Curated annotation (Swiss-Prot):
Gene3D superfamilies: 3.30.1370.30, 3.30.1490.10. GO terms for cellular component: chloroplast; ribonucleoprotein complex; ribosome. HAMAP family: Ribosomal_uS8_B (MF_01302_B). Belongs to the universal ribosomal protein uS8 family. One of its GO terms (molecular function) is rRNA binding. GO terms for biological process: translation. Transmembrane segments: none annotated. Part of the 30S ribosomal subunit. This is Small ribosomal subunit protein uS8c. InterPro entries: Ribosomal_uS8, Ribosomal_uS8_CS, Ribosomal_uS8_sf. Keywords: Chloroplast, Plastid, Ribonucleoprotein, Ribosomal protein, RNA-binding, rRNA-binding. It comes from Ceratophyllum demersum. The gene is rps8. It is found in: Plastid, Chloroplast. One of the primary rRNA binding proteins, it binds directly to 16S rRNA central domain where it helps coordinate assembly of the platform of the 30S subunit.
Length: 132
């Protein structure tokens, strides 16, 4: 049985968010780095830095906090395509989350990108997760 690394990072971020942690440490792979880069660019996390410990690479992500409040933003992270049930979509059928307010992360032939980028380029792919 293999590990589902995408579900692991989504669960780590969700658990850190619920426990009001400021940072979360995630094992680093190429796919994970691409997803975290998208989350950083879209504003769901505040900062990311690479960390190496015992010859293993990690990403330390700082979660985004509300101004003048103690809690973090409540992000809903949902895994759509999983190892037991892959979900693919063409460019016309990529789902919109909350009318375009949320994002869908896809794995395409041109790399990992958001639903907006995939629609602009006119390509589809595997729907990895949704965030709103």
């Amino acid at each position: 049985m293999g590990r589902d690394t995408i579900s692991n990072i989504l669960t780590s971020i969700r658990n850190a968010d619920m426990n009001k942690k400021e940072t979360v440490r995630i094992p680093s792979t190429n796919i994970i780095e691409s997803i975290v880069r998208i989350l950083l660019r879209e504003g769901f996390i505040e900062n990311v830095r690479k960390h190496q410990e015992n010859n293993k690479n990690f990403l330390v992500s700082t979660l985004r906090h509300r101004r003048n409040r103690t809690g973090t933003y409540r992000n809903i992270l949902k895994r759509i395509s999983r190892p037991g049930l892959r979900i693919y979509s063409n460019s016309q059928r990529i789902p919109r989350i909350l009318g375009g307010m949320g994002i869908v992360i896809l794995s395409t032939s041109r790399g990992i990108m958001t639903d907006r980028e995939a629609r602009l380029e006119g390509i589809g792919g595997e729907i990895l997760c949704s965030i709103w």
